[in-house]
Curated annotation (Swiss-Prot):
Homodimer. One of its GO terms (biological process) is L-valine biosynthetic process. The keyword Lyase applies. It catalyses: (2R)-2,3-dihydroxy-3-methylbutanoate = 3-methyl-2-oxobutanoate + H2O; (2R,3R)-2,3-dihydroxy-3-methylpentanoate = (S)-3-methyl-2-oxopentanoate + H2O. [2Fe-2S] cluster binds at residues 47, 120, 192. Functions in the biosynthesis of branched-chain amino acids. Catalyzes the dehydration of (2R,3R)-2,3-dihydroxy-3-methylpentanoate (2,3-dihydroxy-3-methylvalerate) into 2-oxo-3-methylpentanoate (2-oxo-3-methylvalerate) and of (2R)-2,3-dihydroxy-3-methylbutanoate (2,3-dihydroxyisovalerate) into 2-oxo-3-methylbutanoate (2-oxoisovalerate), the penultimate precursor to L-isoleucine and L-valine, respectively. The lineage of its organism: Bacteria, Bacillati, Cyanobacteriota, Cyanophyceae, Synechococcales. Keywords: 2Fe-2S, Amino-acid biosynthesis, Branched-chain amino acid biosynthesis, Iron, Iron-sulfur, Lyase, Magnesium, Metal-binding. This is Dihydroxy-acid dehydratase. It comes from Prochlorococcus marinus (strain MIT 9211).
Length: 556
């Protein structure tokens, strides 16, 4: 029996049917599945500006496939626009709002399935969390990646603009060049074009089996993206008939597959946070140490920005995520028996994919000739992060750094010091009170890290924080330090000039202060005053878990 029969069947549901008739239902529609189309369309950001067209095509395809679509909106936040401002505190919060809104609409209206369409970073994990909670047949349609901008024969992304700020302040470029980068780095619709957070999470969702093959790397403005949205609707209607549900796909093995692909493509640190959160909603026992275990086995085989050369549309041309998955599968690094939304296994889905990457490209390397022999997202532990933290270590020349702490209580204070050239080679920059509770909202530190890179210090300093990093960040950066400063983590006890060791080889992050001194400082530490007592940020700060647990708000 369809779940929607609760609102469509029986004499007592005559008023319900009357409402449905007013939005287009006819007599013969009340026995059809009702599919919610969660539309993240927004003119706030280029990531989402093209979504309505995809939603309309998915809606039409749903009808043709024998189901009844009901479209509703959900929010988005533009990380790129809010970056470096107080507004960025709402970014991670929006993941929870998106999840809550999709769950609310679908469950309130007794929908039989949901097709979610998203573009910007938090759209993907937000939709996945909702799908896992509801466990009704579901599929995700990614809005697509942006094509690269061009200037002087070079590919540009939004990160180019952030780095240009640092280049300008250090005298490496003129203001005219900065404006030229600004005008050319984002040429149209789509999510930020490197293997940043949005493209990382879309790749993870494709690997998990909840979006169609190749769909995670398509360009937003290409015709195949429309065709993919239409086909997604048909596949979802079929999944309802077969009763294929998200929790049939979201297993420990499938999450291990997703982590492996994130490592192979050189994906964002945010994947750690989001996959932990999705797993929690799925009832899957995934922990931060699983990322380190898989990192040790899976090499980086894709040369993608931010630390590499190419952008996501180049990956698509080279074979996309299916090609990456095939290489991992043949190497024994992927579980082939995991189910996909199409009702077939990973093995079956990849059976016709070549066992070697195309010879006429340099985006995907053979598994035997990786770009890096191990994954790039290392989990470090030590007295500065007893619950762990995440370091992005690909493309860095300084995997070990011991230096004096430069301590900042906010992102703004740190950026000001960087732009005033107060950061020296060998420094360990500490930005604290930016965690899930302390921010609140765990802002991304793209502005400081890009300014550092722009000044030529990207491989000469380390930056550690209880906040997050954008998927566009590279260099020796360590985020998600847990416990965070605002709940009394040892990062709160760091003083200016303390020596800190960051050792990616030993997976160590250590404050070189003895326990006796730390205990003394701990007794003197005072919990910071709550920054937001009301509104969504106040509510979030009261509810949110540690970043080591995914920074979720629906913990029992």
């Amino acid at each position: 029996m369809l779940r929607s029969s609760a609102i469509t069947q029986g004499i007592q549901r005559s008023p319900n049917r009357a409402m449905l008739r007013a939005v287009g239902f006819n007599d013969n529609d009340f026995n059809k599945p009702i599919i919610g189309i969660a539309n993240g369309y927004s003119t706030i950001t280029p990531c989402n500006v093209g979504l309505n067209n995809l939603a309309l095509h998915a809606e039409a395809s749903t009808k043709v496939s024998g189901a009844m679509p009901q479209m509703f909106g959900t929010i988005t936040v533009s990380d790129g626009i809010s970056m470096g401002t107080e507004g960025m505190k709402y970014s991670l919060v929006s993941r929870e709002v998106i999840a809550d809104s999709i769950e609310t609409a679908c469950n309130a209206q007794s929908m039989d399935g949901v097709l979610a369409i998203g573009g910007c970073d938090k759209n993907m994990p937000g939709a996945m969390i909702a799908m896992a909670r509801m466990n009704i047949p579901a599929i995700f349609v990614y809005g697509g990646t942006i094509k690269p901008g061009k200037l002087d024969g070079c590919d540009l992304t939004v990160v180019s603009a952030f780095e240009a700020v640092g280049q300008l302040t250090s005298g490496k470029i003129t203001e005219d060049k900065l404006i030229a980068v600004e005008k050319n780095c984002i040429p149209g619709a789509g999510s930020c074009g490197g293997m940043f957070t949005a493209n990382t999470m879309s790749a993870a969702i494709e690997t998990l089996g909840l979006s169609l093959p190749y769909s995670s790397t398509m360009a937003a403005e290409d015709k195949e993206k429309i065709e993919s949205a239409e086909r997604s609707a048909k596949v979802l209607v079929d999944a309802i008939e077969k009763n294929i549900r998200p929790l049939d796909l979201l297993t420990k093995k499938s999450f291990e597959n997703a982590i492996a692909v994130v490592m192979a493509v050189g994906g964002s640190t945010n994947a750690v946070l989001h996959l932990l959160a999705i797993a929690r909603s799925s009832g899957v026992d995934l922990c931060i140490d699983d990322f380190e275990r898989i990192r040790q086995k899976v090499p980086v085989i894709c040369d993608l920005k931010p630390s590499g050369k190419y952008v996501t549309v180049d990956l698509h041309k080279a074979g996309g995520i299916p090609q990456v998955m095939k290489l991992l599968l043949d190497a024994g690094l992927l579980h082939g028996d995991c189910l996909t939304i199409e009702g077939i296994t990973i093995d079956e889905s990849l059976k016709n994919i070549p066992s070697e990457p195309p010879a006429n490209q340099n985006v995907i390397s053979p598994i035997t000739k990786p770009i890096y022999k191990k994954g790039h997202l290392a989990i470090l532990k030590g007295n500065l992060a007893t619950e762990g933290c995440v370091a992005k270590i690909s493309g860095i020349r300084t995997p070990v750094l011991k230096g004096p702490a430069k301590v900042f209580e906010s992102e703004e204070d740190c950026l000001d010091a960087i732009l005033k050239e107060q950061i020296q080679e060998g420094d360990v920059i500490v930005i604290r009170n930016e965690g899930p509770v302390g921010g609140p909202g765990m802002r991304e530190m793209l502005a400081p890290t890009s300014a550092i890179v722009g000044q030529g210090l990207g491989d000469k300093v380390a930056l550690i924080t209880d906040g997050r990093f954008s998927g566009g960040t590279y260099g020796l950066v360590v985020g998600h330090i847990a416990p965070e400063a605002s709940v009394g983590g040892n990062i709160a006890l760091v003083k200016e000039g303390d020596m800190i060791t960051v050792d990616a080889h030993k997976k160590l992050i250590q404050l070189e202060v003895d326990e006796k001194e730390l205990s003394k400082r701990r007794t003197l530490w005072e919990k910071p005053e709550v920054k937001y007592k009301t509104g969504i940020l106040g509510k979030y700060a009261r509810l949110v878990s540690s970043s080591s647990k995914g920074a979720v708000t629906d913990q029992p």
